[in-house]
C-alpha cells in the first residue's frame, strides 16, 4: 500500500511539474529526480508493475527522453493485462506519440491501429491517426477517421480542423 501511495504521489508531482504553475527550474530538477527515484524503487520491488512503467514513460516523454520513454512504454505494454482495454489503448497511444516524435510514423500508425482495435470509438486515437495519416499524405484514410470522429461528436473542433487540412490537400 505504501509503495502504491508513493507512486501515486510521484504521479501528482509529475502533473504539478508539467502544469503551467511549474516550479523554478532548480526545484524542477529536484522534483524530477525524486520522482524518478520513486519509480525506480517501485520497479525494483515489482519489475512487472505496468502502471509504474507507464507513469515513468510519461515522465520521460515529458522530459523529451524518447529512448527511455520508449523502453518503459514497451515494458508497460508487455505487462499490461489484456482485459484492461481502455488503459492498454492509452499505452498504445503514448507509444504512438513517442514513435512519432522519433520519426517512426509507420510504427506509430501500427500502434494507433492497435488502440482502435481495443477501443474502436476512442476519440483521441481517431484524431491522432487522422493527423498522422495527413502527415503521411493518406488524405482519404484521414478523412474517414475525421468523419468517424464527427459522427461521434458533431462539434469536434479536431474533426473540423482535420477535414479542413484534408480539403486543403485534395
PLM feature spans:
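Structural marker of alpha-solenoid helical repeat scaffolds
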Residues: 45, 79-83, 118, 152
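Canonical tetratricopeptide repeat
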Residues: 55, 87-90, 94, 128, ...
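Register position in tetratricopeptide repeats
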Residues: 62, 101, 135-136, 162, ...
Amino acid at each position: 500500500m505504501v509503495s502504491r501511495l508513493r507512486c501515486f504521489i510521484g504521479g501528482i508531482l509529475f502533473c504539478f511539474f508539467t502544469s503551467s504553475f511549474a516550479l523554478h527550474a532548480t526545484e524542477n530538477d529536484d522534483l524530477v529526480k525524486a520522482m524518478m527515484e520513486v519509480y525506480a524503487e517501485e520497479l525494483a520491488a515489482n519489475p512487472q508493475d505496468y502502471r509504474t512503467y507507464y507513469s515513468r514513460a510519461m515522465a520521460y516523454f515529458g522530459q523529451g527522453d524518447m529512448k527511455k520513454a520508449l523502453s518503459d512504454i514497451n515494458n508497460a505494454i508487455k505487462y499490461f493485462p489484456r482485459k484492461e482495454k481502455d488503459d492498454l489503448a492509452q499505452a498504445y497511444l503514448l507509444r504512438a506519440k513517442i514513435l512519432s516524435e522519433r520519426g517512426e510514423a509507420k510504427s506509430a500508425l501500427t500502434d494507433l491501429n492497435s488502440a482502435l482495435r481495443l477501443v474502436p470509438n476512442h476519440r483521441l486515437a481517431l484524431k491522432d491517426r487522422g493527423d498522422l495519416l495527413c502527415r503521411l499524405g493518406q488524405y482519404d484514410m484521414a478523412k474517414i477517421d475525421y468523419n468517424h470522429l464527427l459522427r461521434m461528436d458533431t462539434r469536434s473542433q479536431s474533426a473540423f480542423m482535420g477535414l479542413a487540412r484534408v480539403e486543403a490537400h485534395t
